[in-house]
Each structure stands twice: as C-alpha cells, then as structure tokens.
C-alpha cells in the first residue's frame, strides 16, 4: 500500500512538472525515508491523472497507522508538507526559471510561479474550493463576498499542545523570509513547500510570494526582507510603483499602519496585490478636483463608501510627490465639525490605505483616508464596523475589504444554514445561542420579505449579508456619501 501511494505521489510530481522524469528514483527514496522505510516494491500498474488530496490522504493514514503522527489537522498539515518537500525544486532553481520566463514577459513568470505554488500544495486548492463566494449588487458596484473556510479550524488537542509549546522567536513572524523551507511546529505552519522570489523595490531587498489562502485570483504578498514594522511614508508609494512597473498586470496595495484600521500584521512591512479587478478599481470618479502645484495630475473623489482620493498620471513620480503631499496633510489634519482629529492625548489617528495599479499606459493611485479614533459609544473605532453589524463582521476593515471584498468569518457558514432552517420552520432564533445574535436582523428581513420561502431564502440571506457589508464599509468611511460628508471631504481637499 505504501509503495503504491508513493508511486502515485511521484507520478503527480512528474505530471505537474515539479520533478523531471530523471528524478523518479531519487524522489521515491526521499519519500521512503520520511516513513523510515527501507523497502519498496514498484507497483505493476501505471497511474495517471493523480488527485493530490486523495494520495496525501492515503499517505497520512499510513503515517497515523504507523504511529508517526497524531490524527489531527495540525500534525497532518505538518507531515504532508514534509512529503511535498520531497517533490520541490530548490529555491535557486525556482528563481532561475522565474526570471527566465520573466524575460519572455512578466505574466509568463507569474503564471509559472502561481501554478507552482498550487501544484506544491502550498496553496491547498481543495481547501480554497471550500470557500463560499458570491457577489452582491450595490450602489457602489458589484461587491465580492467570501466566507473563508480554507484556514482549517484547529482541534482542541492541537490548541492544548500549542499552549504547552513555548513561543519560538524563529521565524520572527509568518512573513519573514526564514519561513522558506521551515519544517514548522504545532504553533507555526510548515513551509517546506514554500518558495519566495527575491525582488528589488526602492533599491532594497524584498520578497514576492503568494498567499496560501488566496482570497482572490493570484493573491500575492510582497514583504520586506527584514522584520521591520509597517509604516506609510513617501517610500511606500515608491515601492508600490516599483512593483507595478515590474509586474504591470498586478495591482499592489498596503494596509494602513495604525491599529483598528490596519491589517492583522503590523510588525512586518508588507503589501498585498494580485491579478484581479475589484469593485473599487471599477468605481468612477464622482467629482474631479485640481490640486495646486499638481494641475497636470488627474485627481478626484471616488464614488465609494470609504473616502478615496484617486490620482492618475503617466509619470508615477508625479503621483509619488502628490501622494506624499496628501499623506503629510492628512496626518496633521483636524476638522472638529467633521469629527476628524489628527491626534488625541498624543496618539495619532490619521493614516492612509494606498492602492497602486496601471491602467493602459496610465498609473493610478487610490488614497483611502483612514482614522482610528475611538469613543465611549464606539470603543472599537468610530470609523470601524458599528456594533449593530458585528453579528456579521466585527473584524478590522483592512486593505482587501477596502477594495470591495468581504472576508467573513467561517462561523457564518453554519449560522446562515441554521438561520435558513429556523426561519422556514418558524423556530425561535433566540433559543439557539449560535444564532441569537442575528435576531434583530432577521426581524427586519421578515418585514422586508413577507414571502420568504424555501426557494428564495438562500439568495435573500446572501444578498442581505452583502448589504450588511456595504453598511460596514460606510461605517469605515471618514466622510459619508451624503451632501454634508462631501462638503467635509472638499474642505480637506481644499486645504491641500
């Protein structure tokens, strides 16, 4: 059985191009060693069109039966990554192939690297497929909604084991280049099948990789080779455009550098990008503006729930200069009438979420104005999802959400299924603690849709979840899409 499963995995490596035909024996022997096995019988039958998930499941069962690992998703992930490492080309080979293909054209290089990142099981295709995805029409365009199910839920045993492991300081975080080839531990994922392409932006060493959880097509991460904290400054804009010049078919954006309005990792300077057009990129300029000293730069307020100033020019240097001017002005800007305070008690509040892209021969930069002030009424943030929407989304509104993609928690899959069941059978929603938090929302829905039934309930819930996301984005907008909000926004623009 083991020999057969190993033969299948090796065949998968040959079929996908991870290994050449001449490395068949070598790879077989590496895999035998992982199982502490010194005997092998080549199967008589030939295997084709191998399904990776099935073969790995066979090999994981074998490892559990032999007592090599515990039957838990954490240990299984560590082990199957070790198996995939036996099929992986070395980093130098990946880099050489990447830049050779880049010589043909940048897209050929990223196509190769994205396929490798999936074939290697670094991106687990069969898990990403489980994510629930749909779109919702809104006044701001077609928004993307996803319930993220590709991050596996840790089981209680693994959580307990992780508690007992003293937290290591190597690698310093999940974005450090030292992750490449790392075997992992209970509280840190294995990254033996992970490859990084070194790139130079702003004359400094950075790394280019894909996100293992791909929230959208070719979701990439670009990170500083050194563990330095996030900081939005002039150099941020230089780096964004250096990358877009290298890969003009990709956009690249940065999370803000302050808590509440920033991303989940503020400790390591990084950007996120990819080959995808978000609703925000399609959103039109609602009001064109001219900024003194930058009359040659097309600028305007975008029709978008967050407060976005879009600037466009064929020369990215002009955009870098203007973005720096806007950033410096916003950092120090206070307008009490609009409830915008640059700082309170010495704590800064104003920052920017920038997104760079190239459209035809024109460079474009979206500057999203952010503010992380809190009040007694809104202790998690005034410009953050308000409490009435926390039953759907209470996490930070980071770069991905800013662009129009809701990344919703996995709990919603079960909760929405339960809601369908309870609504159709007329059961009391407050009687189930898993869904009691949705009670007020459901009351509103029942008034809005008196003819809700088994045929339409699924579509109705999906649509209404999407509309909650719209409200959440509006909450995160410093200047609201109202006459007063636009007037307040123009006061800032006029101050430039």
What are these regions (language model features)?
Residues 206-211, 236, 240-244, 290-297:
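Structured alpha-helical segments in the cores of large, soluble enzyme domains
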Residues 1-222, 226-229, 303-305, 319-323, ...:
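Active-site microenvironments that recognize anionic phosphate/pyrophosphate groups
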Residues 239-243, 325, 468:
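Amphipathic alpha-helical segments that form well-ordered structural scaffolds
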Residues 244, 248-267, 273-327, 331-334:
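Catalytic or ion-translocation cores adjacent to nucleophile or general acid/base/metal-coordination motifs
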Residues 193-195, 227-252:
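Helical scaffold of the NTase/Pol beta-like nucleotidyltransferase catalytic core
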């Amino acid at each position: 059985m083991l020999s057969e499963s190993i033969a299948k995995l090796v065949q998968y490596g040959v079929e996908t191009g991870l290994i050449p035909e001449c490395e068949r024996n070598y790879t077989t022997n590496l895999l035998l060693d992982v199982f502490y096995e010194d005997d092998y019988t080549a199967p008589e039958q030939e295997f084709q069109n191998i399904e990776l998930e099935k073969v790995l499941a066979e090999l994981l069962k074998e490892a559990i039966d032999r007592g090599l690992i515990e039957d838990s998703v954490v240990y299984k992930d560590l082990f199957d990554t070790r198996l995939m490492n036996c099929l992986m080309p070395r980093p130098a080979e990946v880099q050489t192939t990447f830049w050779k293909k880049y010589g043909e054209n940048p897209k050929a290089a990223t196509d190769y690297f994205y396929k490798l990142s999936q074939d290697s099981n670094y991106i687990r295709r069969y898990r990403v497929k489980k994510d629930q995805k749909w779109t919702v029409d809104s006044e701001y365009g077609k928004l993307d909604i996803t319930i993220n199910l590709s991050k596996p839920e840790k089981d209680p045993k693994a959580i307990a084991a992780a508690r007992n492991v003293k937290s290591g300081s190597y690698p310093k975080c999940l974005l450090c280049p030292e992750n490449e080839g790392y075997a992992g531990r209970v509280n840190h994922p294995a990254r033996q099948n992970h490859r990084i392409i070194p790139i130079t932006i702003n004359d400094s060493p950075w790394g280019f990789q894909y996100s293992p959880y791909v929230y959208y097509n070719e979701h990439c991460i670009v990170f500083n080779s050194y563990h330095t904290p996030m900081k939005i400054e002039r150099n941020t804009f230089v780096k964004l455009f250096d990358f877009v010049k290298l890969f003009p078919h990709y956009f690249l954006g940065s999370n803000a550098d302050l808590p509440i309005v920033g991303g989940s990792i503020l400790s390591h300077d990084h950007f996120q990008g990819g080959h995808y057009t978000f609703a925000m990129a399609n959103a039109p300029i609602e009001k064109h503006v001219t900024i003194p000293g930058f009359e040659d730069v097309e600028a305007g307020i975008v029709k978008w729930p967050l407060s976005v100033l879009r600037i466009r020019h064929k020369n990215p240097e002009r955009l870098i200069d203007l973005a720096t001017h806007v950033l410096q002005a916003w950092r120090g800007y206070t307008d009490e009438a609009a409830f915008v305070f640059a700082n309170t008690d010495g704590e800064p509040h104003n920052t920017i979420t920038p997104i760079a892209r190239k459209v035809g021969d024109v460079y474009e930069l979206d500057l999203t104005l952010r503010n992380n002030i809190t009040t007694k009424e809104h202790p998690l943030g005034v410009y953050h999802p308000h409490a009435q929407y926390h039953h759907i989304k209470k996490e930070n509104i980071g770069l991905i959400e800013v662009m129009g993609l809701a990344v919703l928690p996995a709990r919603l899959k079960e909760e929405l299924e339960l809601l369908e069941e309870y609504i159709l059978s007329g059961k009391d929603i407050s009687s189930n603690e898993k869904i009691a938090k949705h009670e007020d929302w459901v009351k509103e829905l029942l008034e809005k849709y008196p003819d809700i039934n088994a045929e339409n309930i699924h579509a109705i819930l999906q649509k209404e979840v999407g509309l909650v996301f719209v409200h959440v984005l509006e909450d995160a907008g410093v200047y609201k899409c109202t006459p007063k909000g636009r007037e307040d926004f123009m006061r800032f623009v006029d101050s430039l």
